Amino acid sequence: MADEGTLNIRYNSHATAEIIEGPQSGEADGSVMAYNYRLILTRDPANKIMVSKPANFDLALAKAASGGGFVPNLPNHKVAWNGGRLVGPQNDYPGGDWATRAAISKRYLDAMLMRLWWMQNDLDAPERLRKQFAGYGLAADEFPDNNHAPYEIYVREARRLVGRYVFKEQDNVIADGIARTPIHSDSIAITDWPVDSVACLPRNAPGSNTDGILFLGEETRPAQVPYRSILTTEVENLLVPVALSASHVG
């Protein structure tokens, strides 16, 4: 279970997908999910810009920026690459100033471009990745004034409101006695995606995936999001629908 307003790290087993309790389960540690960019790629010869080897290429960084995959079948022969999830730098983003956040964002973009070049050009890269990414370049007609990269990094999780209600793990699972998720009289939305977290820290427990990864596809059910979770406890006439009041697992 996740304490309200705190991060509850669990480990996800490769073989059985069972939860493996961590040594400090239930204690907050300040970690959030890894970030990345959603680069738009294409194999269209008339609309692709192949990535050259970055001047600051770092093989270790290229290999570390792993995870994720393609969102296929976008219009105009494009895919969205939801990968390059470098684990660790994101934890300094929520409390960082604008200069810190800009530096972290640049590190993620650099790492993704390094990884793309490595997967396409290094024979030591896994054959599966070389085949998957062969021929893909940045879409020339996407973000042409920003070197064809999105303007913003994909911030999965950062600073959040602690509001009049904290939406948490228990709101996403079957409640005792009613065979459904908890009912909120002030519900304003219904969740659709299962409880899901990408990696949070670059470490692995024995027999486990990277720290923080979980996907509770079987346990999660559609849940009601109460109006109170977007209301502050102190400020009137303010709604916070994006950075709403929720725990990490919520």
Model-derived regions, located:
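Flavin (FAD/FMN)-binding glycine-rich loop and adjacent Rossmann-like elements that form
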Residues: M1-V249
